[in-house]
């Protein structure tokens, strides 16, 4: 199991954090050139490791199972049908009808 660690602002010196904020604002405003400056690149390299994993969190097996289970439960709810379709006898095998839910 992999644990992701995000650095909090309190862990690093306040000056370094202030530099990071200023560097990000410059990049957004388009004042800085396309390439990273030596100082900015260094700060980016340090923070990028911590925050990239925080942004992209992979779907765990347990979470996928939970999502799938929730969907299959909602499939079982009976949908209301209009009067003319209610009394129509079923045709074919019932197991075929169930298979529709397993696609998800």
From Swiss-Prot:
In residue numbers, the region (Disordered) covers 23-104
PANTHER family in alphabetical order: PROTAMINE-2 (PTHR21341:SF2)
UniProt gene name: PRM2
Compartment(s): Nucleus; Chromosome
Q: Which UniProt keywords apply?
A: Chromosome, Developmental protein, Differentiation, DNA condensation, DNA-binding, Nucleosome core, Nucleus, Phosphoprotein, Spermatogenesis
Subunit organization: Interacts with TDRP.
- Which species does this protein come from? Callithrix jacchus (White-tufted-ear marmoset)
Query: What processing steps or modifications follow its translation?
Result: Proteolytic processing into mature chains is required for histone eviction during spermatogenesis. Transition proteins (TNP1 and TNP2) are required for processing.
Q: Where is the composition biased (Low complexity)?
A: 24-35
Taxon lineage: Eukaryota, Metazoa, Chordata, Craniata, Vertebrata
| Basic residues bias (residue ranges) | 54-104
Found, by tissue, as follows: Testis.
One Pfam entry name: Protamine_P2
Query: What's the name of the protein?
Result: Protamine-2
Gene Ontology CC entries for this record: male germ cell nucleus; nucleosome
PTM annotation (Phosphoserine): residues: 8, 10, 37
Q: What is its main location?
A: nucleus
Listed under GO biological process in this entry are: chromosome condensation; nucleus organization; spermatid development; spermatogenesis
Q: Which family does it belong to?
A: Belongs to the protamine P2 family.
**GO MF, one example:** DNA binding
> What is the recorded function of this protein according to its Swiss-Prot or TrEMBL entry?
Protamines substitute for histones in the chromatin of sperm during the haploid phase of spermatogenesis. They compact sperm DNA into a highly condensed, stable and inactive complex.
């Amino acid at each position: 199991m992999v644990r992701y660690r995000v650095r909090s602002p309190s862990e690093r010196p306040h000056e370094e954090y202030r530099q990071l904020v200023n560097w990000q604002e410059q990049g957004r405003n388009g004042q800085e050139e396309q390439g990273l400056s030596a100082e900015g690149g260094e700060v980016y390299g340090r923070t990028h490791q911590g925050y990239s994993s925080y942004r992209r969190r992979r779907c765990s097996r347990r979470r996928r199972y939970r999502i799938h289970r929730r969907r299959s439960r909602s499939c079982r709810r009976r949908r209301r049908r209009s009067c003319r379709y209610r009394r129509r006898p079923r045709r074919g095998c019932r197991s075929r009808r169930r298979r529709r839910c397993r696609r998800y």
